[in-house]
Amino acid sequence: MEAKAIGKTIRIAPRKVRLVVDLIRGKNVKEAQAILMFTPRGASPVIAKVLDSAIANRTHNLNLNLENLFVKEVWANESITMKRMLPRAKGSGHLIRKRTSHITVVVAERE
């Protein structure tokens, strides 16, 4: 049985989130939490929060322990992009894209 948690519209670019997400895919839950705790990236605490939510969904809704729990799937998709203008010379402007992410974590029990 699987449990899923989704973090929506996280204010970090998906390209940066995917660097951290690739580290925990397929790992045991405890090992994934340790990796996220010691990874010096801005996306690490956010992914850890979504992972904790998926674990809580699994233990609360299905009344199971987390001994054999592992990260089955994890991915980061692009969300909305906020657009801002930066004034430049001669009355022109450059577009600044502030990208956001949807982070999905699926945990399952290893057989």
Swiss-Prot record:
Q: Please describe the quaternary structure of this protein.
A: Part of the 50S ribosomal subunit.
The record's similarity note reads:
Belongs to the universal ribosomal protein uL22 family.
- Tell me the GO molecular function terms: rRNA binding; structural constituent of ribosome
Q: Is the keyword RNA-binding assigned to this protein?
A: yes
Question: Which gene produces this protein?
Answer: rplV
Which keywords does the record carry?
A: Ribonucleoprotein, Ribosomal protein, RNA-binding, rRNA-binding
UniProt key word rRNA-binding: yes
Q: What is this protein called?
A: Large ribosomal subunit protein uL22
GO cellular component annotations of the record: cytosolic large ribosomal subunit
Q: What job does this protein perform?
A: This protein binds specifically to 23S rRNA; its binding is stimulated by other ribosomal proteins, e.g. L4, L17, and L20. It is important during the early stages of 50S assembly. It makes multiple contacts with different domains of the 23S rRNA in the assembled 50S subunit and ribosome. The globular domain of the protein is located near the polypeptide exit tunnel on the outside of the subunit, while an extended beta-hairpin is found that lines the wall of the exit tunnel in the center of the 70S ribosome.
Biological process according to GO = translation
Write down the PROSITE patterns for this protein, in alphabetical order. RIBOSOMAL_L22
